[in-house]
């Protein structure tokens, strides 16, 4: 929006023409918005009694969280949208693709949270309907980017740590994109089980995608680093920084002991947005490395289900795996910080892969 005013109202603020400055302003704006509005949201969440529903079969330590409000993802989404609309060039179609996922998946998460709170049940929206709506939005997103934008019509798959790292997969790319969108949103959702556990890996991952969006818009740098050239992808860096700032602002209230949880409205929206950005940048496989914590959590749930159905035995004492460590007696803050450390290391490994060959 500021770009529009600067151009058509002849304000001549040259600083707005520089991506790094707009990205920094975007981060700071979303951060301070959350710091300001967070206490008000938390107050009204408590007044409306939007408390986290605790599973009866969950860790006993979680009963102390039953009076902690959820649905904090609402003010995460608000601050991201505010900064994005304020600082991004809104003629850039990539921005609207990600915003559509942010809002669409956030709405599904909101309905899920609302049903949990209303009916005092941890199930919320039925699983089949949840995946149905997530899938519908995912396929609409994929169709839109393939029909409307020739710059990302390529169906090449970029494989990290390979000398010849681009492989043509044709129509399989549609299914890969679908699994990235739906999978990432649910992976973040599964990870969001401890205070601050999910939001910090989201921040790290988003920082990595920010760098790649900057590299991808320069044909020489993208060729040198073996990343896909995506024209005008630098605007995504501003949106990414809005996510980082919003995440840091939310962590202010979500760090142990949490005053608010993001709920499904936040985790589905953030996970879906990260998946969408990775698809636009052709970094679907690198996303798996960057978001290794989310992958680990998801695999732990899948293995637990398979093992119990086939062997009638559990691999983990409880899934997702962060609950396993809780049951083993490891303190919650230790689990959280160690997962953050692993997430940071995975980010560094993923960045090394850009020029390893």
Curated annotation (Swiss-Prot):
Chain ranges passing through the membrane: 23-43, 70-90, 91-111, 127-147, 171-191, 196-216, 236-256, 260-280, 286-306, 334-354
Keyword vocabulary terms for this entry: Cell cycle, Cell division, Cell inner membrane, Cell membrane, Cell shape, Cell wall biogenesis/degradation, Magnesium, Membrane, Metal-binding, Peptidoglycan synthesis, Transferase, Transmembrane, Transmembrane helix
Record pathway: Cell wall biogenesis; peptidoglycan biosynthesis
One Pfam family matching this protein: Glycos_transf_4
Top-rank taxon: Bacteria
GO biological process, alphabetically ordered: cell division; cell wall organization; peptidoglycan biosynthetic process; regulation of cell shape
UniProt EC number: 2.7.8.13
Cofactor: Mg(2+)
Catalytic activity: UDP-N-acetyl-alpha-D-muramoyl-L-alanyl-gamma-D-glutamyl-meso-2,6-diaminopimeloyl-D-alanyl-D-alanine + di-trans,octa-cis-undecaprenyl phosphate = di-trans,octa-cis-undecaprenyl diphospho-N-acetyl-alpha-D-muramoyl-L-alanyl-D-glutamyl-meso-2,6-diaminopimeloyl-D-alanyl-D-alanine + UMP
Protein name in the entry: Phospho-N-acetylmuramoyl-pentapeptide-transferase
């Amino acid at each position: 929006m500021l770009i529009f005013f600067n151009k058509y109202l002849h304000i001549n603020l040259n600083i707005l023409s520089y991506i790094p400055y707009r990205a920094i302003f975007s981060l700071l704006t979303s951060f301070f918005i959350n710091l300001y509005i967070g206490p008000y949201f938390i107050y009204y969440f408590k007044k409306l009694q939007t408390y986290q529903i605790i599973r009866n079969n969950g860790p006993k330590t979680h009963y102390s969280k039953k009076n902690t409000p959820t649905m904090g993802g609402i003010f995460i989404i608000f601050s991201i949208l505010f900064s994005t609309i304020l600082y991004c060039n809104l003629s850039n179609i990539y921005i609207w693709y990600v915003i559509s996922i942010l809002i669409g998946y956030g709405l599904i998460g909101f309905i899920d949270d609302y049903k949990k709170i209303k009916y005092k049940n941890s199930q919320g929206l039925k699983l089949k309907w949840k995946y149905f709506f997530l899938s519908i939005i995912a396929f609409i997103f994929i169709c839109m980017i393939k029909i409307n934008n020739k710059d990302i019509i390529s169906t090449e798959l970029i494989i990290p740590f390979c000398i010849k790292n681009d492989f043509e997969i044709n129509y399989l790319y549609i299914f890969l994109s679908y699994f990235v969108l739906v999978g990432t949103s649910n992976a973040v959702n599964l990870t969001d089980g401890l205070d601050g556990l999910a939001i910090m890996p989201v921040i790290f991952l988003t920082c990595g995608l920010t760098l790649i969006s900057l590299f991808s818009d320069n044909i020489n740098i993208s060729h040198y680093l073996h990343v896909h050239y995506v024209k005008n992808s630098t605007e995504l860096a501003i949106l990414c920084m809005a996510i980082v700032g919003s995440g840091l602002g939310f962590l202010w209230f979500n760090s142990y002991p949490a005053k608010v949880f993001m709920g499904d409205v936040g985790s589905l929206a953030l996970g879906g947005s990260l998946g969408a950005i990775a698809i636009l940048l052709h970094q679907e496989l690198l996303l798996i490395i960057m978001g290794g914590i989310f992958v680990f959590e998801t695999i732990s749930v899948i293995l637990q289900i398979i093992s119990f159905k086939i062997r009638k035995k559990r691999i983990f004492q409880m899934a997702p795996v962060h609950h396993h460590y809780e049951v083993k007696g490891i303190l919650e803050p230790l689990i959280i910080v160690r997962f953050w450390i692993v997430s940071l290391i995975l980010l560094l490994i993923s960045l090394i892969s850009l020029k390893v060959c």
